[in-house]
Each structure stands twice: as structure tokens, then as C-alpha cells.
Amino acid sequence: MTIYLFDGTMDGLLTAVFDAFSLKEQPEELLTEGDALPLFCERTYQVTTDEEKARRVWTGLEKKLTREAMKLISVSWLSEQKELNTPLFRYVCKVFRQGDISRNYADADVLAVTNIARKVLHEQLRMKQFIRFQKAKDGTYLAVVSPDHNVLPIIIDHFQDRFNDQPWLIYDAKRHYGFNYDGKTVIRITFEDESAVPFDLTNGKLDESVISSDDQLLQNLWRTYFKAICIKERLNPRKQLNDMPRRYWKYMTEKN
């Protein structure tokens, strides 16, 4: 049994595909460095990430797959799930051997990659629905999130289109980065010292010293409205949890 080890990056995975074809091998698994090896592992091969090799593999995929299938691969990678590594590696290898297999759901690897991508896209939709902004005194709107998957890169266009006339910051507290829009361009940002930021990473609330007084009033009005429209006789907690999972509540105004 041959196992390939890589650095956990997309370029690393694509390099592994390049090396597998160059060496004429079909490794049983693709694992990240430090993962426990299977009991009957006979040989390991350390993949050295090479951007040029990765670029050539990606260009080759673009020639064989539809735009939709390429998007599926990119989206699945945003899941950050280790169990994706081997199925996605085999999926890409099969594309070069068999052509476009993106709709062959009888193939276990295609099905695994597709299902993971669908979970990411589902959370992308939920983020668009559940993000709550707060207005700071300087006019900037802040939203803090901590999604299961790394969906910020695929939701930013939505907010740039919808709120293109106001500055905002959407920050992923789980991955310690965000996107800031100044009214013209969007840039990716990180904070050297998160303890010094003027908001609480655990619930997304702005410090009282920087939150707009108008926003405080609107938050109270929104909570009042949310309670007022509730019809006790029609409460369905199970459906509410299904439509609005509890893990999102800590950042939602109406739940705090």
C-alpha cells in the first residue's frame, strides 16, 4: 500500500496528481503530514508542493471539465474537511484517465466530492440569510461569523453587490480573517492582535464605545418586532432549529 503525504493545500493536492502520473503510481490514500498511517502501509511518498505543476494540472482540468464541474471542485475544497483529500485526489486522477465524470454519481469519489460541495453551498446560502450587521460610529457595518466551512470567499460578491454604497467588514472569527469594503474595493484583512479589536469575537457585538446610537435603537426595535410577531400557538422549535441551526444564534440580534 502506497500513501502520498502532502501539505494540506490545494496546490499540494494538484502536485500530488502530477507526481502520481509522472511516477505511474496509483496511491491508495492522500494524507496530510502528521496523519496516522494505515496499519498495512508499505511505502510513503512525500509530495513537495510545486506551483507550476499545480498550475499545469489545473489548466488540464479546465480543458476536460465544464465550468460548473470546476466550480464544484473549488467549492468542495472550501469545506476544509480532511476526508475530502483522498476522494478529490482520485476524482481528479480519474478525470485525466476517463474524461468528464462529474455527473457519474455511481462513482463513490464523484459522489463524495459532490455531497461535500453541496454542504458548502448550503452554508453559503445560510450565511447570506443569517449575517447580521452592526453600525459603528464611523459608518462602517460589522458582521462576525464562524461558519463550519470557509465560505467567506464565495459570499463576498453578494454583499458587495447588495451593499455597494456603504463600508462594511465581515470577519470570520474561526479562521481569523475577514473582508473589508471601503465603498470601492474589497480587501482581505487579518488582525495582528485580536484582543485589541473593538468587538467581541464570541458574539460579534461591537463595543459600546464604538457602536452607533442609531444601531442600538434599531437592534432593540428588531428584538421587539421579532417577539411581537411570534404566535405562541404556532411555535415549532424543531422546525426552527432545522431552518436556523443553533450554532448561528450567537451572532443574531434577535437571539441575543
Residue map of PLM features:
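Short, charged/polar micro-motifs that form catalytic or ligand-binding hotspots
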Residues: I3-G8, R43, V47, R103-A106, ...
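Charged, alpha-helical interface segments at or near domain boundaries
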Residues: L31-K128
